[in-house]
């Protein structure tokens, strides 16, 4: 009898065990689609990014014009650029929903998978930040100046560190060229980490909405979930195309239509929408070092979540108090995102401070208490 190549070939076997014959829980919902959507986002961003890099010039005197030239004179350059810029937004929408799913259903108890996921988020944030600087518009330049300047808050070595990162005494040509190099490199780092993420995931298998072991009821990934993933791909790519074709500048900052000018500061310096929650937390503390620590903590707190799990149930499906707390946290993050886009004045300052306090309070204090309380109420 002939050997089945798909199951025996050294390379095809890996693909088969990851995408075709993978045993998958029979009850995972649409919330489990976002992992594969993130994969599609990454592939799309790498392809469009490579095409853009072929026409981009990483020089302060040419960067802005090279992007304008791309949109005007390169075949479909405008489309490639719009897909790349809005693809980043879709990437962050998917990753935030993916993290929210993990948080709600207790997927963070697969500790290795979760920790690699948090590292992936940090790498994605770094990639998006350095990429935002490349068009060399006003907000690119001032965003880079403000955010890199935060490292100067580090005691003793801060100022040296910032000047080393800048390659001079301000954000200038050396900064732009190294940011381009980093922006080219990091997506491949993300791709590598994604493989590690999947390797750890396939050690334990996927979690499911009930948060219970599902080894007794597994189904093959293909055709059941492959077709479900293709539906997700279609919906996401249609959304991306719609955004890129009908309102490509909806999520961008109008300041970036003006070339970078170190002598004119924009009235409101703010990052892209996907960083606004962290920016609001940074601004809510009236001390530079304190703000930087809060900013770092707002994302690094994700590493602590597996350690703060007190409930004897994995998922929140049957935990109404935790569910209420979870949706309060989601609302709080939306409020922080809104506050981050507003000027620093009354009442936004106090709203931002309260929302920042609530964010840390819910994750560090209320979730563990409510988890323990639910154990008590359910006599677990």
Swiss-Prot record:
CDD domains, sorted: cytochrome_b_C, Cytochrome_b_N
GO biological-process terms attached to the record: mitochondrial electron transport, ubiquinol to cytochrome c
4Fe-4S recorded as keyword: no
Superkingdom of this protein's organism: Eukaryota
Cofactor binding mode and count: Binds 2 heme b groups non-covalently.
Pfam family, one: Cytochrom_B_C
Amino-acid positions noted as binding heme b b562 in the UniProt annotation, renumbered to this chain: 84, 183
Residue spans crossing the bilayer: 34-54, 78-99, 114-134, 179-199, 227-247, 289-309, 321-341, 348-368
Gene3D superfamilies documented for this protein: Cytochrome Bc1 Complex, Chain C
GO molecular function: metal ion binding; ubiquinol-cytochrome-c reductase activity
This protein's GO CC annotations: mitochondrial inner membrane; respiratory chain complex III
The protein's required cofactors: heme b
Mode of membrane association: Multi-pass membrane protein
Binding site for a ubiquinone: 202
Keywords tagged on the record: Electron transport, Heme, Iron, Membrane, Metal-binding, Mitochondrion, Mitochondrion inner membrane, Respiratory chain, Transmembrane, Transmembrane helix, Transport, Ubiquinone
Binding annotation for heme b b566: 98, 197
Localization terms from the record: Mitochondrion inner membrane
Function: Component of the ubiquinol-cytochrome c reductase complex (complex III or cytochrome b-c1 complex) that is part of the mitochondrial respiratory chain. The b-c1 complex mediates electron transfer from ubiquinol to cytochrome c. Contributes to the generation of a proton gradient across the mitochondrial membrane that is then used for ATP synthesis.
Subunit (UniProt): The cytochrome bc1 complex contains 11 subunits: 3 respiratory subunits (MT-CYB, CYC1 and UQCRFS1), 2 core proteins (UQCRC1 and UQCRC2) and 6 low-molecular weight proteins (UQCRH/QCR6, UQCRB/QCR7, UQCRQ/QCR8, UQCR10/QCR9, UQCR11/QCR10 and a cleavage product of UQCRFS1). This cytochrome bc1 complex then forms a dimer.
Note: Heme 1 (or BL or b562) is low-potential and absorbs at about 562 nm, and heme 2 (or BH or b566) is high-potential and absorbs at about 566 nm.
Entry similarity comment: Belongs to the cytochrome b family.
Full protein name: Cytochrome b
The encoding gene: MT-CYB
